Amino acid sequence: MTAAPRNPLIVIPARLAASRLPDKPLADIHGRPMIAHVLDRAREADIGPVVVACADAAIADAVAAAGGRAVLTDPAHPSGSDRVWEAVCRVDPDGRHDAVVNVQGDLPTIDPAAVRAVFGPLARPGTDIATLAAEIVRVEERTDPNVVKAVVELAPGARDGRALYFTRATAPWGEGPLFHHIGLYAYRREALARFVALPPAALERREKLEQLRALAAGMTIAVAIVDTVPLGVDTAADLERARALLDPRTGARPALP
């Protein structure tokens, strides 16, 4: 039986080349770059050290100014997972960290409890990867292809289960809840090493969902159910919402946009 991971490393991948909101890791939120706020949230989770895997020197400089640790990675990486793995290998070549938590760099309002929640299911024997989902409550999201659905084998009353599929379609069919997948991941270290070495899968290319590569290879993904979906900053409007949520005058930081 594989022992439960006990020493996670949090890695935040970040790059400037975003099509809808260029330079978004450096976007100003109340006098600080967005990446500094993400760094704060990851530190507040208090489950392990935090590293930012940067594609650009400007991001590394911003992280250093915020008192964080940054690693410059190959800007040509095809995915955030590849960037995360390079950072892991560089900061921990001896393999002291037995798990890796990937926190996306565009989640400045993420609840630190969500970061802790995604790490928890790795304790279950046989789990390679863990991620999060929340029940869809907005009717329009059920048919929105930009809202990725997690199809989860979930016992009645359970708060975590096993992923059967991820899709942009409305699934599963029939009565019952649908779950909005949240792109936060925790990996056993050996699972991340295996994942980045795999070739893209046919369904991954069709759905444009990287996590399907793991399912196609027979890897087990656990899904923890949380109450809310964090605000991902992809547009100028999202940025304004993040600024409102992080306004120091209100003192509030809700996880739900």
Swiss-Prot record:
It catalyses: 3-deoxy-alpha-D-manno-oct-2-ulosonate + CTP = CMP-3-deoxy-beta-D-manno-octulosonate + diphosphate. Pathway: Nucleotide-sugar biosynthesis; CMP-3-deoxy-D-manno-octulosonate biosynthesis; CMP-3-deoxy-D-manno-octulosonate from 3-deoxy-D-manno-octulosonate and CTP: step 1/1; Bacterial outer membrane biogenesis; lipopolysaccharide biosynthesis. NCBIfam families: kdsB, PRK05450.1-1, PRK05450.1-5. InterPro entries: Cytidylyl_trans (IPR003329), KdsB (IPR004528), Nucleotide-diphossugar_trans (IPR029044). Belongs to the KdsB family. HAMAP family: KdsB. Its EC number is 2.7.7.38. SUPFAM superfamilies: Nucleotide-diphospho-sugar transferases. GO terms for molecular function: 3-deoxy-manno-octulosonate cytidylyltransferase activity. Keywords: Cytoplasm, Lipopolysaccharide biosynthesis, Nucleotidyltransferase, Transferase. It comes from the Bacteria. The keyword tRNA processing does not apply. Activates KDO (a required 8-carbon sugar) for incorporation into bacterial lipopolysaccharide in Gram-negative bacteria. This is 3-deoxy-manno-octulosonate cytidylyltransferase. CDD domains: CMP-KDO-Synthetase. GO terms for cellular component: cytosol. Its main location: cytoplasm. GO terms for biological process: CMP-keto-3-deoxy-D-manno-octulosonic acid biosynthetic process; lipopolysaccharide biosynthetic process. It is an enzyme of class 2 (transferase).
